[in-house]
Amino acid sequence: MSYLVDTHCHLIFKDFREDLDSVINNAFNSGVKGMLVISTQEEEFNPLINLTQKYSNIFCSIGIHPHSAHLHSDISEELIIKFANNDRVIGIGETGLDFYYENSEKDIQIQLFKRHINASRETQLPIIIHTRDADDVTIDILKKESKKGSFPGVIHCFTAGPELAKAALDLGFYISLSGIVTFKNAEELRETIKDIPLERILVETDSPYLSPEPVRGGRNEPANVVHTANYLANFYDIDKQSFYEKTTDNFLKLFNKAKIINE
């Protein structure tokens, strides 16, 4: 029996404080056998690792979200690498650029993004990229940095246009799709992703945000990645179990430090 991995969730956010164990067990019982819990600021590093040590199929990343870049402008790639050496850490991020909200100055976001890239290049752990209203700058940085040495990565919660999709695929990156793809007003996104090879697609919730149809509007949780996966299986005209198997295989290829026990 095939299973799914939620490749991007935020389980240590306060939204899950009261019922985290129940949320995790609900995911396991729904066929979501693995979860990658994402770091957004330095204060989360140790709590994330502690959580992953409690559950064998939960892993974490280490990084600073662009919204928090101004609060961690002095963080070094050496510190990121130090935490990344932990057995339970399988990715770098989420990092990147967000020029929509601009909670942090653009220059600070760019500096931290490049430090994360250096850490990814050094460790060869995949970089998990957030980009919003910054696609051209993101593409430019990724192309220039890749010339210094390759690094694996994924564009998380992909909502961009074909230019970023092509640039990411050309660099060997993966594209992660969230519940947004199920929204009625996401026609442009669906048009962009229709030709992306299945070998490069991951699925995620970005929970507690972005609940997919038919549960849109409530708190999102890892179990709901099933809805997104089922929608995409139909979209790509592939049976559900094959889609589950393909996206899980993609996850294990990209995040090759992860070992999932399927019981």
Residue ranges and their predicted role:
Residues M1-E263:
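Mid-domain alpha/beta scaffold segments of enzyme catalytic cores
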